[in-house]
Amino acid sequence: MKNRLECMQSIRFLAVLLMCCLSYTTWAQTQSNVNGLVTDFSGEPLIGVSILVKGTSNGTVTDLDGKFSLSAEMGNMLQISYVGYISQEVKVESDKLLRIIMEEDTKKLEEVVVIGYGTQKKVNLTGAVAAVSAEDLASKPVMSTAQALAGLAPGLSVLQTSGRPGQGATVKIRGTGTFSKAGTDPLVLIDGLSGNIDDVDPNDIQSISFLKDAASASIYGNRAANGVILIETKKGAQGKTTITYSNSFGWQQPTELPDFLPSWEYAKYYNMAMRNMGKQEAYLPEQIQKYRDGSDPDNYPNVNHLKWLLESGSGFQHQHNLSIQGGNATTSYNLSVGYRNQEGMTAKTSNERMTALFTMKSEIAKGLMLNLNINAYNNKYNAPNGEPQSIDGMIGYAVRQGPIYAGQKSDGSFGYQDNYSPEAWLASESFVQNVSRNISASGQLTWNTPVDGLSFIGKVGMNYWTKYDKAYRADTYFDESKTVGPATLNVWTANNTYTTFEALATYEKQIKNHTFKLLAGTSVEQSNNKGLEGYRNTFPNNYLYELGSGDKSTATNDSSLEEYALLSFFGRINYAWKDRYLLEVNLRYDGSSRFADGHRWGLFPSVSAGWRISEEDFWKNAAVSAVVDNLKLRASYGVLGNQNIGVYPYQQIYELGHDYPFGNPATLQSGAYMKTYNNPEITWEKTAITDIGLDFSLLNGRFSGTLDYFYKYTSDILAPVEVSSIMGREVGQSNVGAVSNEGIEVNLTYNGQIGRDFWFSISPNFTWVRNAVEKLANGATEEINNNRIVGQPIGIIYGYETDGLFVDQAEVDAATEQLVSKSGLKPGYVKYKDISGPDGVPDGKVDAQYDRTVLGSTTPKFYYGLNLSTSYKGFDFSALLQGLGGHKRLIGSYMAYAFYNGGQIQRWQAESCWKEENPDKWAEYPRLETLNMNDTNLQTSDYWVRNASFLRVKNIQIGYTFPKAWTKKIGLENVRVYVSGQNLFSFNSFYKGWDPENEIGTGDSPSYYPVNSIYSFGFNFKF
């Protein structure tokens, strides 16, 4: 029995051993090293191609010769991926060398961009067009579309001048083209309808195109001189319904804040200022001590009014967007709703906005397509009111009010300076409320006729906008001796109705190697704008703030009505031979009711050509084609117009309210008088643009870029013409000015991959612009009061050059004659240079006529951006840097001058001022004294001008997308979380505590709202 058991165990052991051997043999036959070579179609080896065994983490990359080797089983699928090429899968079927040929991803070559009245392949563009996609905007969860564009595209200047809730940004394309009231705003079209760039939620945008030259923009004629921005909203797609929800939550704080001295130091340096002026000190030592120890805060306070005001609000903001997309074989749709709420850094300040978007595309019959677009918003802005009547003004005067003035005292009263007390006004029932609503709707029918390539398009659109604004300033209690009143109420209401109709025909035909595209159309636009305003004061209490509650005897009112129309005919011809030689001609004929008969019609043509050098046989056969796969040279010229000059400026203007005596005996009769001489000859401003560009891509699309040179010349700029005062009245505008902008744009992008999972993209852009005034009215070479000189940029700073400060009395005695007599000069004062005289050489005295010069310009010479993005497995990181440079700024008033008009003193002024014990010629601040606007030291000079260039870390975002294997378990297709920072910090040499991008007042009534940094987080869900 025992032997039998031993025999059975031996048999089992041998069986197991045999099975192991067989298994090993089978494994050895199926598991082996797979060797391969990866090349492109020309046979060139591709380096760094990712090779991954599907369903595993087993992978490798190709070496310098395009070769790879890895272990795999027979039947395994290898996933091959490479930037610029179509990913593919290859089955392991033998141990022979795998030869894999990668197919170039033609998506880049087939990429289309939105242009005027259509789309165009990017590689076939002959104009200067930049594009921003939904993905570019997604990494910047900002409240404003305009703010999201900063640094994204060459030729685009974006300035965020305020952090006020709901505030957008100023957008310019290729410099400042005019100094007239026609303005520099680009034409913005949202799904083909005229609008504002912030009318649409950034989450609802599919793409934005910037038409920068005449070739791309002339199809819009006399509205396109400042460039055109085309916004396309998101559309639905065929397939199952998808629901997407995104949100963000964030907090704001100022990017910069001035460092004001506390009350005891304020008193100390105020005494110094008094001594420097030969006056008695204002504060005794025991008073300064009371300010320091805080023992009597009502009478000896220490209040930083600016900091208090900017910390009175929560600064919390949140936004949400929910969209539903879907469709079938004939119909697709997109429905989106959005909500955002931004609480200000100051209390009672907020912006609440609700948006809705609906788009639909449906084939209602064979060859007949219907497109519907509806976009709407409701916007509500709230802010405190006071003296002056805006939150910006309140902040400006909080800059002025020193720490020696109390906030709210223990008895409930308020400290104040004149009529200014942010604490009192914020506690009052005063308010500003602005409510605006807008709905934009369009319908388009497209008939693709039985004739191949021929289509007809009809489109109607309507935009209705309304607003209701209310500003109430209550009777406001300061203390027993001061109440500001009476209460006042201003109400404004307005509405605008804009309608448009378009009819277009397009035809596309290819004859052998010749491709033709034709477009012809006409459009009619009408605008009707109505306004009404009313005012009353003296109300029974602070809670009845309706016009009917005010004193009827104080009532005033006004109304307005403006209408204009535009009739246009336009066309475009595109020709291409083998997609190698490209030609485009645009023509638009506009008639505008804004001008007088005989001057209403204008022709706006453009022509452009392109040469795709990379399509030439000699290029394809050259070795360089293996590196440079796309190379195109293009050039364009055309003329654009700017009709945005107001309504009917050619008409004679009469002013009512002037009585005249009539009859015998003479009695006064109601009448009017002619206020201005009209000019029926005026017409639109014209901008001629020359553009030469180069587009290229290398390394199979991994590295691409564009280079552009442009020259813009704007003529017939509208400006008033000076006439003799003997005429007794004003003269209307005339086409008398000219401005030029010459520049270079560079845009580069590199997309790379390291290993299997690490992807990155680097995209810098740079724009340099030389702006110059070319012509002024009456043949003048300068208009100093308007800061304009022929040959200089718009917005010059005109003033005195300085030679530091007077060090001592000996230097004062030896100095040339300054702006004041020597008896009024002191050591530590600004020393102005004598640079010229009547004969063009220094004449021994400084005066305004001969010794002022151009100190700089507020117009930037260059702007740039750097976009960085990376992803590793589920993690992603993006960063955006934005900068402007080559310009200067001058701020004054309470922001720059210590003790100005009873204002404060900042730490840098106190610590860096000229002192008798340390008489520094180059001290950052002059001799400390109390100041007002007419002081000698405060003349516009290079002493006060600062370099306003800056480099800002505009946005950083870090996100994580959860694996689909996880999210599908909870019924979600995609889940992403992120943290983000906006306006994180900047590098600049501007005034300490002040942001160079901020719009800051310079006069005795300054106003500003600090630009804000935003720290946020959010979630994206896709169902």
Region annotations inferred by a language model:
Residues 1-357, 362-365, 369-371, 375, ...:
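Short, small/polar-rich motifs associated with maturation and membrane association
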Residues 178, 193-236, 256-262, 303-321, ...:
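Outer-membrane beta-barrel proteins
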Residues 244-298, 649, 734, 751-858, ...:
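Conserved small-residue
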Residues 254-256, 297-338, 342-349, 355-423, ...:
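Flexible loop and strand-edge segments within Gram-negative outer membrane beta-barrel domains
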Residues 266-301, 390-425, 470-488, 530-557, ...:
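Surface-exposed loop/turn segments flanking beta-strands in extracellular/periplasmic regions
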Residues 295, 592, 884-976, 981:
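Extracytoplasmic gating/loop element in the C-terminal half of outer-membrane beta-barrel translocons
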Residues 313-331, 338-340, 423-471, 490-510, ...:
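Outer-membrane beta-barrel transmembrane strands
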Residues 344-353, 375-388, 436-438, 446-540, ...:
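Small-side-chain secondary-structure face that scaffolds active or pore-lining regions
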